[in-house]
Amino acid sequence: MMNLIRYQLYRLLRSYSTYFTMLAIMGLNVMLVSMNAAFAYEFPEHGTVSYFNTFIFDTGAFLMLFGLWSVVFTTGEISNGFIKQIVPLVNNKVKIFLSNLVVCGIMYLLTCVVTFIGTTIASFIFVDGIKLGSMVDYGVVVFTEFFLHLAVASIGMTITYLIKNFFASIAAVFAVVSGMTSVIFPGLEYILKQITGDKDLCICSWCISLSSTQVSYSVVDYKLPLTEIIVLPIILFVLYSVIAGITIIKRDVK
């Protein structure tokens, strides 16, 4: 298992897509800071460095780019022959998925660090006298979004293993993360309401594209209890990880 993780880390650090994704996410958030600099003067209680660092989560851009990167990363191990060579040597194919998941988690944390540094510097450049704000709130956002982004990585890996076509996988992940597939939720919600009789039933928030923006927005603005905030991300993470694990076991991924 450790050898698999080391190899995947080697691929991560040698891949151009890794650095492109990091710089793209950081660049987008810096651009958002420059465009919303006046916000810090109008609402000083919210216009802080920690608040600006959540912008990239609010827009869903981090989630989108991370999901697309997971497809590129997974496609790479298939196209370079790594899967074909390693599967006969691994007694449990789930280890391949788990090693990928560990590396995706490292990629997420590295990207958060790079984005935080770039955004913090940009905040002090564009806004005079800006305050640091609550790092606890920002830490909670990063922590809860961690599970959502790994859930998206699981989706990306699952689709790539199933389709085995780069462009089709990119299109499928884009549809899921952008919320295009969320059109099924109202119909499913209506059916469940009829079955259960619960008129207050709401499953639209289970759409992963909506969950990402709701988590960061809730932490910073609504101050919801931590347990209430992290339940959905963890459930989605476990759900999609199980689906990905079953897929790699049942599917010929060579």
Language-model features and meaning:
Residues R11, T75, I86-P88, G156, ...:
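Helix-capping/transition residues at the boundaries of transmembrane alpha-helices
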Residues T18-F73, F97-F174, S178-Y190, S212-P233:
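Secretory targeting signals
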Residues V87-P88, K93, V176, I191-Q194:
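Membrane interface segments of multi-pass transport proteins and intramembrane proteases
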Residues Q8, V90-N92, I159, N165, ...:
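Generic structural signal for small/hydrophobic residues in well-ordered secondary structure
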Residues M1-I25:
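Aromatic- and glycine-rich beta-strand/loop motifs that create alpha-glucan
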Residues F185-S212:
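Juxtamembrane non-transmembrane "cap" segments at the membrane-aqueous interface
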Residues Q8, L232-K254:
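Junction motif at the cytosolic side of a transmembrane helix
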Residues S70-L89, K93-V94, V253:
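Transmembrane helix boundary and interhelical loop/hinge segments in multi-pass membrane proteins
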